[in-house]
Every structure is written in C-alpha cells, then in structure tokens.
Amino acid sequence: MKITGFQPLIVSPEAEKLISLFEELGFEQRHEKTGINDKEISNVSMKDANGFRVDVTKGATVPTDLTAIRMNVDDFSEAYELLVKHGFKNAQGYRLTQTSSSTDTLMVSPSGFGIVLSQHIKD
C-alpha cells in the first residue's frame, strides 16, 4: 500500500468562515465535492502556493469542529485492514462513502484520533 496524499481535514458547522480564513492565508479552492452520502454535505479541497493542502467539510451536523487527517492510498482494502488491526473502527459501521471519484470513510482510533481513509478512483 502506498500513501498518495496526507493532509488535515476539518469538519465544521462554520465551514464558510474557515474557508475564508484559509483564503486569507493564501489557500485557493481547488475543487468541491457535493452531495456526499446523498446529503447536503460537501468537501472543499484547498491548496497554497507551497503545495500545502487542507480540506474543509461543510453541511455535516456536528456541534463543534472535528479535525482529522485525510489519508489517500492506492489500496483502500489493505489500508482499512491495517487500521482495523490497530484498533481503529469505521465511524459509519460497515458503510463506505462511494462517490464517482473516490471511496472514503472515517476511521477512529480507540483514543478518538480520526483518519479519513480515501482511495481515488482512476479511470
């Protein structure tokens, strides 16, 4: 398994304010994925001139900000099993989020640390 991306992901009830803050810090919106899990949830990927990245998720019903690491991999199943072996649990039970461009899920460690595991679908 190869890690192909590794950046912070912030889920926030005030996502628009965070996006504005990161824009003032020099980040630009690269793309936005909408309708995640058939809900009004969207994720904005941002990048600055130095190549640093951050993702901001909006529309999720969380009372406060939740910060995790987004880890993109080339083999979702292998990474998923590795995290399970280390005590991580899928926050969606057995469900995975499937979109036209990726497979994702939030994996949570026994201490509460979150990794959003993701594999991009390549045509």
Predicted regions and their residues:
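Short coil/turn motifs at beta-sheet boundaries
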Residues: 1, 39, 64, 98-100
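Conserved short beta-strand elements that form part of the metal-binding/catalytic scaffold
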Residues: 29-65, 108-109, 114-121
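Short beta->alpha connector loops
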Residues: 36, 61, 75, 97-98
